[in-house]
Amino acid sequence: MGQLTKQFGKIKISLPIPHLLNLQIDSYEKFLQEGVPEAERRPDEGLEGVFHTVFPIEDFNKTASLEFVSYEIGEPKYDQAECISKGLTYEAPMRIKVRLVVYDADEASGNRTIRDIKEQDIYFGTLPLMTEKGTFIINGTERVIVNQLQRSPGIIFEHDGGKTHTSRKVLYSCRVIPMRGSWLDFDFDHKDILYVRIDRRRKMPATILFKAMGMSKEQILDYFYTQETYRLEERNTIFWEVRKELYRKDNAYADIVDSEGNVIVKAGKPITKRSWRLICEAGIEAIEMRPDTLDGMFLAGDVADPKTGELLAEAADEITPGLLDRMRDAGINRVSVLHTKGNDTSSSIRDTLMLDRIPDQLKAQEEIYRRLRPSSPPTAEIAASFFDNLFRNPDYYDLSPVGRYKLNQRLSLDEPSDLRTLTDNDILTAIKVLVHLKDSHGPADDIDHLGNRRVRLVGELVENQYRIGLVRMERAIKERMSLQEISTLMPHDLINPKPVAAVLKEFFGTSQLSQFMDQTNSLSEVTHKRRLSALGPGGLTRERAGFEVRDVHTSHYGRICPIETPEGPNIGLIVSLTTFAKVNDYGFIETPYHVVREGRVTDEVLHLDASREGDQVVAQANALLDEQGNLVDEFVTVRVKGEVEMRHRDEVTLMDISPSQMVSISAALIPFLEHDDANRALMGSNMQRQAVPLLRSEKPLVGTGMEVDVARDSGACIVAPADGKIEYVDADRIVVAYEGDVYKKQGGVRAYDLLKYHKSNQNSCFGQKPSCHPGQIVKKGQILADGPGIDDGELALGKNLVVAFMPWCGYNYEDSILISERTVKEDVFTSIHIEEFEVVARDTKLGPEEITRDIPNVSEDMLRNLDESGIIRIGAAVKPDDILVGKITPKGETQLTPEEKLLRAIFGEKARDVKNTSLKVPPGVEGTIIDVKVFNRRSGEKDDRTLAIEGHDTAVLDQKEADHMRALTDRTRALLIPHVVGKQVAASLPGKKKGEVLVEAGAALTEEMLASLPVKKLSGLFKSKEVNDAVAEILKPYDQQVDYLHAIYDSKREKVTEGDDLPPGVIKMVKVHIAIKRKLSVGDKMAGRHGNKGVVSCILPEEDMPFFADGRPVDIVLNPLGVPSRMNIGQIMETHLGWGAKELGRQLAELLDSGAAMQVLRDEVKSIFSSDDINALVDEMDDEEFKASVSKLRNGIVTKTPVFDGATEEEIWSWMERAGLANDGKTTLYDGRTGEAFKNRVTTGVMYMLKLHHLVDEKIHARSTGPYSLVTQQPLGGKAQFGGQRLGEMEVWALEAYGAAYLLQEFLTVKSDDVTGRVKMYEKIVKGDNFLEAGLPESFNVLVKELMSLGLNVTLHQEEGKKKPKRTGYMREREDEA
């Protein structure tokens, strides 16, 4: 049955929002490739890829090789719930199949022949598994691996903006970043010399690298420059040989004449592009130039005397008049020079070459080796192999497919994607592009553009760690292979998986990217999994990240949310993925667009990353369209390269999918986001994640439509994976029989255990409640049970309250909140929090600790709630200092008195010398015991409490199994009905009792008979062979499914009774869960969804609250001054829309209660909702369904106003008029204390308010006497340490200003760090002598010791009787003046 919801959105969104957790789940699935058959696993991806990069492992002599064949992941030993309860990691065992090949080597030929092959399956440790919610359970706590946003491998061109050198010259540079391997940097200095750095080491001229690659001087010049040829003729005349591509804008030295004598360019006139074309067309071969044209040009090759062979000049030498004369004398009449006169070609490469004195390839390679390995002297072979490994060897250098893709894209290359090393052509092309950039002063690449930043997802992060572990293991394997006789070894002798396990454990346990999941509510869970962090290993650090990295970039549109980011030092470094964004195979974030052709929006959807969006003209999602999808306006607002422009509709190429595609889910939950200031929207989206799930959830009257998606995808609800039927429902369990192939092993039947009083990571209480009934037919994607903070399948983090914006006696000062006592009385904002306390009994040197009820010197009253085993009973109400678990610890032997010795001698029993170390309730905790777990050693004895818990757990499992089996049997019976009902039975079937017959021979079977028969007895029961075959066909899988279920439940029962693996030295461990009910109290922090936060300052009786003319009081009073300066007007729009919704809902309920005709009610509903979908839904419903739906609207009509596509001002006014409210949103309120009307009309309405997890009960704290710091002897600070309040410098000034000297002395001595004074004070209070005697504060002694540590000896001298200081001349003068 659909819900009656008022939709204000106008844009139809054709693409569903992708599953919000796909990012995590798909990535890890791709890494594991678990369900993929061995033959189909992709060898370059995930785990398979990691094994293939490390294996085969050969020994140093190449006589043996260890090859990887395949891997297999087993079933986890414990399920998720058991791992959380026992503090274990949710992981699965892994086995790998490896092959050891031993070779015989022929020393003469060097060939190898296979001598022996051994293949073996080896246990290879465990691998943490991801839960279906996208989290990992590590040591019993749920953790999330946050995705990392980092610089993409590839090439990037940058310049310094003229900031580096004093000349303010812009210096260009380029950097090639691989996934693994050496970084390569090229940069120009202020003299235009090109330098190279490898791995950020000392720079050297870049031509050394070219020579090391095997290029000669001439080849370098030939690659970077085009050559021009000049003819040297008589009488110092010089002719330039014309080549069409070498146009130069010069003045003609002499008339340029064609073959017919026509002058094309006169002497002294410039050669234009038009005249250049005419010169080329006329076939003119050479143009006469000025005699000094060649001065300062550079030779393209060596010049030698043709007669003698003597070298006159080398390539790249500068041409001088003297050199020209020598060339003429030697009879050289043609000379080739480098073309550097053009405005886009400088002589920088030639200048670099002249600076570089390295003659050949060998010397160049040795020079590079020397720079990178300064300590070891190179030989030619070592240097050559080292250079080869730098960029050409895939074992040492990996660009990754992403790097190759970026390189091909930026340098316009066409290399295959599996070429993951650098080629010489890559390097030379990069330099060519860099030189061109410098010469043409082109723009640098933008490193903050999302085309240059990629996301490393969970799978990739874990894959990298796995590779590190395998490389460590590889070293150990190689050493083992060389140390022992290889022919006698088996593969398992070589492989030790411990290094891999250690690396994984470290990553999941302590990495900066493996975080304790934020589990305050369902939204905080989802947003944590969709978070992108620029921090972490290989990323930025908070301190070094500048403003540019943190800022919003135009390429973020539709990919990264510009709103949701933390306030404080991490702002802009931790961001969130937008609603529709996906991450592609290369790790770049993509956003979807509709393709637009000739002004018509098509249904075709394109997912584009930021670099492919480059020149596209993108229209906004709210551009007006006609019925056929054509753009209505001739000129449309579009985005081009991040800039907003107006373009003709025919130029538009793409269109946004939805207005909400530019914000994250958290921001998309804020109605009227478009009317809020960005800073407040940021606070609003962050504070929704801090909302505590309340005792009774209530969905917002004003929502955005995203609530359903968040609730469904969060994992907090139970969602049907396929169509099916509800077989059984109670508060703890739902059993569903599904159609199709889901849960095939269990016969399509799945039993869900609902969470009850589950403690979340943030100590909030998670529980699920069923939202279905037995016999109900459910569809795929339907919600079967609501989770915490979810109401009717929608996210519901707060409550709808009637709000008034008005000052009230100063109780709203500085954003304070005045709230009605009704919210406390009716538990509107009551939440449950669960605290866990743990006690451990250990084996000590003096004997074992014991958990017992028998505690010395403790009254029976203190023990009243403990059972025989000394553990508190479930349901007991506890308060601070109550005993939860009784425990005694043996004390050291003490000297016995003669009397005690006598008693021991008489009674023989050694009187127990133990101290009470029981677990007590800490201060500030008051609640009810809801759960106790006892963990015993496997071999240890079990106490009564453990046996009782085991008995209860086993009974619950038995009941579950019975329900599951019943559902499976009913499902099988339903399948049998069409085959067996009405068919004749071959033989009579006896019952369990003596003489009882269930079915007579020859009788036709009815449905009633079938219901009473055991299903297994139907095998071979019928006369007809076809019927028996059909029955056998159905019963065969049934038997397998029954066996499978029995095996599962038997294993669970075994686990209940088998005992636990406890840490060494631990005998027993007890965990106690206390549920604490926290009602709203003064000091609690509350907030709306628009960043309007405040602290409750007063809880006022209902009768004193301002009230409406009809006597209804408002629930909450907010300060009107909090709105204008903060510019979050969205809250006012929400208030007005919510008021209309509540009022209309109330009117409909009155109509229903007054017994109005059904048709009248239907027409009223249709006119309010005015939507074709709702009209159809209303017509479909029968009267009972319709009544139930209208009754749900009693507290208000749920409205949806999507972000950037919500209700307009006009729509809100007409909605309020429809409800009979004033269209300015104000009304007259009356003072609850006097009954008089307030002077001005007040803005009132309904606002959705949240209670945040900053609760006063968890922060308030008081200290009497407590722990002191060891060195300074001052009280510790903070609630966790039971510390005191610090009296700082400014507080001392305040007391000095009041002249409160004795008070100050008391604060700074006996109440703080005067050790002897503290003891004396105590004694005096005991004696009733309240006189302060302060001593020396310990901090003075600390100061003295610190001075001593500086070598200054400070000693204190007590003066006998104070002597008057000697009067100096200066003092005499001062006294005389006085």
Swiss-Prot record:
Catalytic activity: RNA(n) + a ribonucleoside 5'-triphosphate = RNA(n+1) + diphosphate
Region (Disordered): 1359-1378
Keyword DNA-binding: no
GO annotation terms (biological process): DNA-templated transcription
SUPFAM superfamilies noted in UniProt: beta and beta-prime subunits of DNA dependent RNA-polymerase
GO cellular component, one term: DNA-directed RNA polymerase complex
Stated role: DNA-dependent RNA polymerase catalyzes the transcription of DNA into RNA using the four ribonucleoside triphosphates as substrates.
Protein name: DNA-directed RNA polymerase subunit beta
Organism of this sequence: Desulfovibrio desulfuricans (strain ATCC 27774 / DSM 6949 / MB)
Lineage: Bacteria, Pseudomonadati, Thermodesulfobacteriota, Desulfovibrionia, Desulfovibrionales
